[in-house]
Amino acid sequence: YKRQVWQQASASLAAPSALPAAESLALGQQLMNAVLCTNVVYPVYTRGQYIRHYTPGRWWDCVYTWDSGFIGMGLAQTSLRNAFDCLNTYLMPPDSVDAAFLHHGSMVPTQFYLYAELLNRTGSRKLAAYCYPRLKLYYRFFTGQEGGSTTANLHSGLLRPWDYFYNSGGWDDYPLQHARGGNKLVTPVVTSAYYLRAAKILRLAAKELGLKKDMKEYEQAVSYTHLTLPTNSRV
């Protein structure tokens, strides 16, 4: 039975077309795809229900926000449906009052990059319209505009994620920074840079959906961040 299941599924794991020089790598690509597609944990309890979920290393039986954006981009190489499901796991209904997005781990909004990847691959207006208001809610919390978020509580307007997780960009930050309490006054450049990229991605989606008022909001955010980042940066 297992052999039959494998034979039925193996066709969808065929390595993508490649130049002749890379043909020797085809098996490795197929094996990596197989690992990715079976890297699933169950059950994971979230939002009042049990789900199956892709998780880093098949070891952590929980959700991981920043990892899962990258996992979704990998899934898009094999299954756009699985990639969308991975994205949708972290998005909330536009009228949600409980949470702006599903958060665990570093405040790195990789779901916006996954959204852009899916739009580039599908050109689907339906996908754009479904995800846009959910990602807008995510964006507004990430930028201190929604749900009591404290990410933008400094006069500079630069973003600080420390109230939600101990590191900023998916790495372990300098211990001395935390030992000296620097996280009350310091903003990591990477957080505002991600905000800038998220604004640009949503601006493109808003343009596609004809949301001119939203486009203006993102354009103002992009202009302000371009100005305030170099003004307030220290080396």
Language-model segment annotations:
Residues Y130, R134-S149:
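Active-site cavity-forming subdomains of large catalytic enzyme subunits
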Residues L13-A129, P133-K136, T187-V189, K200:
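Substrate-binding groove/exosite segments of carbohydrate-active enzymes
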Residues Y1-Q4, T225-T231:
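Conserved small/polar residues in nucleotide/adenosyl-binding loops
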Residues K2, V97-S106, T143-Q220:
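The feature captures the catalytic groove of carbohydrate-active enzymes
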Residues K2-A18:
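Mature N-terminal, pre-catalytic/accessory segment of carbohydrate-active enzymes
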Residues M32, L135, M215-L227:
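Short amphipathic alpha-helical coiled-coil/interface segments
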